[in-house]
């Protein structure tokens, strides 16, 4: 990174190596760095205190001031309440998408405006490219250089107002390089914060569901026979593509392919009958285009889950609604999850699967 004149940047600090290294990098190139830790939610207040103590230690090591912002109210509204609402409607939400947009980036942006800071930054593995098009400055969101760690998928809701004042210091680096930098600067996290694909606000989803919903057992229907073959534990416990806890008397693997909240029925099909769980068209809602609305139809590559492979598709509009035509049928398209579309390195936008 190039040396710059003194400008202030607010850096989101989680207590992990990535955000700590991002903050140190920015300080090294001449920014006036202020750390911001967002207090979210955990059922054990002691866990929150442990994390805050960890972040304080990181800020002290890097020698930067630290702001601790209580974001519990916003987190409950935009993440937990939305998650519960989607579950209640029979969908499988990805709360990390809304957490990034409504909590991390919106709150950091609001604090930056209030404190008259020039930029905000996080430890995400993603990149931003500033271009000029038709005499207009546009900020494009790109994949991180480390393809295994790329986190652009989670950022599809970001807009130009946020991107124009955002810096991703780690976007050009691989995880191994970040670890080496942290070692060189002796940034040590005394208590490891695990990188996890699980929900940050609960480590036991079943208990969380039982606490928030009345669950009822119901029929499991085999779609190939159109008859009841078992009983499920409660429809909220299952998601499309799930194999676990399907209690049926078959040796062949069976998967959840559909849920009917009204009848409390779970529909399954065997792995050998792909016609029951494959799709070649996806309808989207809550669409966002990061830079600008592209000319449609648009050839693109799509991810329908964070760790899924890219699939070739065409984005188009039908009756004013956005659809993805999948060129090769894809399995277990899950309502509530995010479909994010790219052209090469550039993230064009995303939407929620209807």
Could you describe each region identified by the protein language model?
Residues 3-6, 14, 121-354:
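AMP-forming adenylation/ATP pyrophosphatase catalytic core
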Residues 1-156, 176-177, 183, 256:
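ATP-dependent adenylation/nucleotidyltransferase module used to activate substrates
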């Amino acid at each position: 990174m190039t040396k710059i004149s003194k400008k202030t940047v607010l850096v989101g600090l989680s207590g992990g190596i990535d955000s700590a290294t991002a903050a140190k990098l920015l300080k090294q190139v001449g920014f006036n760095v202020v750390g911001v830790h967002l207090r979210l939610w955990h059922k054990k207040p002691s866990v929150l205190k442990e994390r805050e103590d960890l972040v304080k230690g990181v800020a002290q090591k890097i020698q930067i001031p630290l702001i601790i912002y209580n974001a519990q109210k916003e987190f409950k509204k935009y993440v937990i309440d939305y998650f519960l609402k989607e579950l209640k409607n029979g969908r499988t939400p990805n709360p990390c998408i809304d957490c990034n947009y409504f909590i991390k980036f919106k709150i950091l942006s609001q604090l930056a405006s209030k404190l008259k800071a020039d930029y905000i930054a996080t430890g995400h593995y993603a990149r931003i490219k500033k271009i000029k098009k038709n005499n207009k400055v546009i900020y494009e969101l790109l994949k991180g250089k480390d393809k295994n760690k790329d986190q652009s998928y989670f950022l599809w809701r970001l807009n130009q107002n946020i991107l124009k004042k955002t810096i991703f210091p780690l976007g050009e680096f691989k995880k191994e390089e970040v670890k080496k930098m942290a070692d060189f600067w002796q940034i040590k996290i005394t208590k490891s914060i695990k990188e996890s694909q699980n929900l940050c606000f609960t480590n036991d989803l079943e208990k969380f569901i039982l606490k928030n919903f009345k669950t009822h057992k119901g029929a499991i229907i085999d779609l190939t026979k159109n008859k009841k073959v078992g009983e499920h534990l409660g429809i909220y416990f299952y998601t499309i593509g799930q194999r676990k806890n399907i209690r049926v008397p078959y040796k062949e693997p069976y998967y959840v392919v559909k849920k009917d909240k009204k009848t409390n029925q779970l529909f399954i099909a065997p792995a050998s009958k792909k016609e029951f769980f494959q799709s070649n068209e996806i309808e989207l809602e809550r669409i966002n285009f990061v830079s600008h609305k592209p000319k449609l139809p648009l050839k693109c590559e799509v991810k329908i889950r964070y760790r899924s492979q890219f699939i070739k598709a065409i984005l188009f509009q039908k009756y004013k609604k956005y659809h993805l035509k999948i060129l090769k049928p894809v399995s277990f398209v899950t309502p509530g999850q995010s479909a994010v579309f790219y052209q090469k390195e550039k993230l064009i936008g995303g939407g929620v699967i209807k």
